[in-house]
Amino acid sequence: MVTSLFYFNGCSLLNFFDKQTKDMPRKHYIGRASTENFQKGIGEVLLGFDYHIEQYDNGPTSSYIITRWKIREGSEDSLSTEFKESKTRLIINGMIDNQSFEMNNGFSYDCFLEIQNFTYNGSDFIPNYEDTELNDEISNLIKNLSSFLSINQ
């Protein structure tokens, strides 16, 4: 059963459930990685798609790889809707499996890819996940990352 949460503020009624679903970034499970594959190998696969790592973040239960924004000119899909350009950033979250600790190899990670894509409409960047060119690129990236992780476990 799905319920919506409504909030009344002055003259406007906001449906938070619909907004949250609409703006939800895309996440994909890409496989299981060793510490070395998470820190080095994933970066090599990302470079093959022209995504450059901007930041690594290690926490007690997970590690993150965050790429720089990749800027692209409007594709045929976006030109028909008058979008000028888009920017895409990837976040790879490696959830640490605490049962997997090995003295020399560190931990194993369950890895998830999150895509953040925004298109410029002339005045603002707005979330957009309907670009065919982007979706094709992300599908290929997911296949390559999953393949790399399955081979190099």
Regions found by a protein language model. Name each.
Residues 1-12:
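Sec-dependent bacterial lipoprotein signal peptides
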Residues 12-153:
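Ser/Thr-rich, low-complexity intrinsically disordered terminal regions
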